[in-house]
């Protein structure tokens, strides 16, 4: 028998689907794939409704056993035909949860499997997940348990060096106090130092531990926050990000989350272009000031909401250990996403005169629904971010100033 370590953040442990109460349920507006067993089960079901819907709405593709068919939706934003008038799944109500396809039974859950370890997570494309991340100060607290199974998982070993690097990065963000930007600045410095090593071995980890300790002290004493404040801002980097992002999302076909995200993008563009004779760069500065004032009045939640978002990114991506991805490039993507989400939030705050965390939840989940629902969508999105980067990873510092 073999011991397997299962690690997961608190938001995973505490998650439960909100069902019919969900603000934007996952049974609409995107591709629902069905495996071969599920297709056959529905087509041969003794339940007339299940069988008839299958005959009318399952497109047989037979690409492979896990992608044997797809649900045909009535429109780009239409509901799955198995969704009933109570916004609940007819399959689950009639045949039970075990009759659900892998797609439907697994979302929003994700499992990152290694030889003797499993890391559990959830997708931010689910609004309930996003709400927990933003509203629970302990959402990213990690817990471990050991399970016993007959054999090790058929997956590569999770190297101890990679695990420690990931923990260093998580810890830097977790000690951000009230400045997530300063913590990200510390992370940039840490990654730049780590890239000096051709190989991360025990000797390199010893040096990196000293660098981590020094950066942590500078974070806690406010040295890094002051250093970041002293960097001359370049708002053109942020306006370029806004224009590139809105171009990208407008180019996508309609799907789940598109109407919600477009509402906030339009709000941002409206605020940035409202006054003649005022540059977009100046308006970016103005709305960021509006957000800062509102967050100052909401001291408690501001200390964890955006921090938790970055912790999630580091955990979910196993940063800085993504295969075949330069760590600084990966960090640029995290910072660019964070900066755009903050700007969308700032525009909403500027128009409302106050921060509504429901707005932030809407922004974050719809952003991820549109940009990272699956690996193919995420790759396309990350390729687009390259046009903002313009070959300079360190320009991300200006997204933090």
Swiss-Prot record:
Broad EC category: transferase
Annotated GO MF terms: methyltransferase activity
Keywords, comma-separated and alphabetical: Methyltransferase, Transferase
The UniProt record lists the keyword Repeat: no
Keyword Mitochondrion: no
EC number(s) per entry: 2.1.1.-
BP GO annotations: methylation
Family: Belongs to the FliB family.
Function text: Post-translationally modifies flagellin by methylation of epsilon amino group of surface-exposed lysine residues.
Identification of the protein by name: Lysine-N-methylase
Taxonomic source organism: Salmonella typhimurium (strain LT2 / SGSC1412 / ATCC 700720)
């Amino acid at each position: 028998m073999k011991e397997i370590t299962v690690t997961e953040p608190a938001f995973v442990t505490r998650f439960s689907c909100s069902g019919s109460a969900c603000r934007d349920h996952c049974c609409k507006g995107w591709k629902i794939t069905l495996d071969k067993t599920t297709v056959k089960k529905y087509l041969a079901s003794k339940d007339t409704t299940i069988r008839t819907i299958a005959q009318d709405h399952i497109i047989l593709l037979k690409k492979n056993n896990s992608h044997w068919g797809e649900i045909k939706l009535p429109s780009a934003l239409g509901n799955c035909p198995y969704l009933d008038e109570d916004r609940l799944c007819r399959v689950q109500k009639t045949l039970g949860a075990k009759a659900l396809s892998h797609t439907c039974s697994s979302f929003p859950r994700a499992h990152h499997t290694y030889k003797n370890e499993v890391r559990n997570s959830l997708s931010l494309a689910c609004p309930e997940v996003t709400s927990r991340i933003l509203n629970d100060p302990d959402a990213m607290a990690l817990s471990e348990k050991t399970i016993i199974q007959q054999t090790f998982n058929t997956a590569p070993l999770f190297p101890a060096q990679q695990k420690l690097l990931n923990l260093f990065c998580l810890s830097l963000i977790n000690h951000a106090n009230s400045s997530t930007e300063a913590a990200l600045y510390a992370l940039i410095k840490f990654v730049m130092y780590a890239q000096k090593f051709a190989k991360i071995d025990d000797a390199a980890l010893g040096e990196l531990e000293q660098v981590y300790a020094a950066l942590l002290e500078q974070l806690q004493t406010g040295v890094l926050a002051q250093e970041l404040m002293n960097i001359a801002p370049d708002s053109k980097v942020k306006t370029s990000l806004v224009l590139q992002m809105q171009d990208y999302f407008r180019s996508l076909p309609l799907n789940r989350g598109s109407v919600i995200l477009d509402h906030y993008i339009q709000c941002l563009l409206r605020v940035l272009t409202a006054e003649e004779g005022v540059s977009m760069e100046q308006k970016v500065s103005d709305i960021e000031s509006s957000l800062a004032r509102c967050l100052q009045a909401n001291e408690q939640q501001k200390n964890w909401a955006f921090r938790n978002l970055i912790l999630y990114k580091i955990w979910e991506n196993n940063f800085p250990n993504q295969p075949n991805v330069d760590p600084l490039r990966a960090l640029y993507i995290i910072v660019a996403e964070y900066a755009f989400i903050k700007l969308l939030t700032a525009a909403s705050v500027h128009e409302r005169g106050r921060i509504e965390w429901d707005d932030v939840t809407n922004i974050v989940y719809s952003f991820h629904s549109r940009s990272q629902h699956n690996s193919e969508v995420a790759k396309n999105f990350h390729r687009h971010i390259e046009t903002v980067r313009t070959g300079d990873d360190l320009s991300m510092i200006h997204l933090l100033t």
